[in-house]
């Protein structure tokens, strides 16, 4: 009976919730970094170094987006940098919101190319969740916030 009671308990600030939040943030951030950010960055570097056609820029141009190369670079940098900031929990809400916008473009890109957008949709749902939740207890956001609160109290005293 004790196991059943524990499994039904709702503790939004309990240890399990905090560790779950950390796991969600780190795993999603690493997956977006690896699958979206790093892959796009490698394509951009190959384009810059060797003039190799950059698939992403071509697909963005096919979407009739103004300045497709600049848009592809922006999407690449957002997915590369913001995902790493999410992993460490730094400015989590801002980075998650930026990633949600970039992933919205990935959803559209997949739909227009007749590909399954399911993975991009799933990542978008996770980062939108992080917009609402923030970085959590085990994040740099929490550490910075705690330090700011301590300094505020010291200055007030």
Which role does the model predict for each range below?
Residues 47-66:
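Perimembrane loop-to-helix junctions flanking transmembrane segments
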Residues 1-47, 66-77, 81, 88-157:
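Extended, low-polarity transmembrane helix blocks
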């Amino acid at each position: 009976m004790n196991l059943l009671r524990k499994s039904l308990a709702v503790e939004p600030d309990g240890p399990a919730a905090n560790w779950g939040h950390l796991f969600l943030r780190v795993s999603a951030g690493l997956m977006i970094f690896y699958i979206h950010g790093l892959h796009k960055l490698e394509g951009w570097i190959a384009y810059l170094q060797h003039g190799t056609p950059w698939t992403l820029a071509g697909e963005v141009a096919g979407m009739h987006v103004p300045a497709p190369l600049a848009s592809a670079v922006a999407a690449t940098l957002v997915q590369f940098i913001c995902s790493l900031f999410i992993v460490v929990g730094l400015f989590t809400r801002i980075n998650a919101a930026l990633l949600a916008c970039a992933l919205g473009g990935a959803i559209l890109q997949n739909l227009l190319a007749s590909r399954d957008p399911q993975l991009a949709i799933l990542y978008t749902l996770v980062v939108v969740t992080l917009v609402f939740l923030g970085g959590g207890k085990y994040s740099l956001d929490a550490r910075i916030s705690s330090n700011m609160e301590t300094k505020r109290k010291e200055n007030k005293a």
